[in-house]
Amino acid sequence: MEKLILPRTNAIRAGLSLPTLSDLTDVVTHPPLTQEATAEPFEYPRDNWGSRIALIGPCSLDSPVSETPDWLASIDRPIVLVSTSSERQNDTALVTATIQALRDEPVHVVASVPTGVPAALAAPNTTVRQFISHAAVLERAVCAVTHGGMGVTQKALSHGVPVCAVPYGRDQFEVARRVEVSGSGTRLPSKKMTPNRLRAKINQARSMTAGARRVAEGFRRAGGAARGAELAERLLSRNAHPGPAAAPKSS
């Protein structure tokens, strides 16, 4: 990827009379401020980033939950949320496996399938929809089964809900690893997924609420979008009102 992107990036920079980059990491380490939408303990401890990189935590776009939908209010069991990618990556099997894994468990599965709900997804203790308010469900969830997407995984952890991450590709493998390392849930590679293995990983994750709450507290302390805006405004204000130039030295 670096061989593909770096020459094109440097060509754009040359047209703007900017110095060339020797490494793609320069993209985030050279600017006066880079904001990362995560925070410790979900982010690994770093001691070499300096003040240019700010961990501000997740920036949720969800509206506050004003009232619980009737279908959600009617569920009287602990809820396990399962969510798949909004990109087509053939991960509907995650919903199918979760339904099979928890068919005889005293829980209710709420699944969101943004790419479209297959007709075959049905079970007595299951609600499947194309789109749902994750925030409303997470207020009552005891576990979230995710494809390892950074958005839904951090959203669950922001609510203190432990995660069972089943990654399929790209950054999802790293997100799932962070779930495991932070003690906020479990990881199960999709290629090794069976209903029995998934059930075991979900039940293990359900015992890790304390770890999920630690991550939630770390996110809360980071400040989110409000702190990000404050840092950006501070930088812009400093650049708009630079300090007085040094007086010339007398000869």
Show which residues each predicted segment covers.
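Acidic, amphipathic alpha-helical patches
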Residues: L24, H134, L198
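C-terminal amphipathic helix plus adjacent low-complexity
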Residues: P195-S251
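Nucleotide-activated donor-binding/catalytic signature segment of Leloir-type glycosyltransferases, i.e.
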Residues: V113-I132
